[in-house]
UniProtKB/Swiss-Prot annotation:
Subcellular location per the Swiss-Prot or TrEMBL entry: Cytoplasm
Highest rank taxon of the organism: Bacteria
Record: active site: 117 (pros-phosphohistidine intermediate)
Protein name: Nucleoside diphosphate kinase
Molecular function (Gene Ontology), one example: nucleoside diphosphate kinase activity
Quaternary structure and partners: Homotetramer.
GO process annotations (BP): CTP biosynthetic process; GTP biosynthetic process; UTP biosynthetic process
Cofactor: Mg(2+)
Protein family: Belongs to the NDK family.
Key word Transferase present: yes
Native species: Rhodococcus erythropolis (strain PR4 / NBRC 100887)
Keyword Kinase: yes
NCBIfam families attached to this UniProt entry: PRK00668.1
Keywords: ATP-binding, Cytoplasm, Kinase, Magnesium, Metal-binding, Nucleotide metabolism, Nucleotide-binding, Phosphoprotein, Transferase
Amino acid sequence: MTERTLVLIKPDAVARGYVGEILSRIERKGLTIAALELRVASEEVAGSHYAEHAERPFYPSLLEFITSGPLVAAVLEGPRAIAAFRQLAGGTDPVDKALPGTIRGDFGLEAQQNLVHGSDSVESAEREIALWFPALSSI
């Protein structure tokens, strides 16, 4: 069964020149890029995307970071796309949790600026795709 997921290549990865490497890893994994856009996230979109963290102490710095510069938003498709990308990304904390060979394990330096975001469930993917790519929404 084909699944869709939202991936964000965050501003730190764009600034450090890792977009090509990350997209290459996605393609080598066998996932299809169904949509891709370079953009600067608005505070409104960023706030909606990270709404579940609104009461957390790191929320203001998270919004500041994700809106700080260009990012790449993409919709990936493929069998078990959500789990496949999350495996490719590695653990959220690049130093303590991400294994070598993963995007975060190879290039990440700290937990908040951890290069990429990938949806964590089918429900999250549907919500996030609707937010970032309304024309592709199935909601």
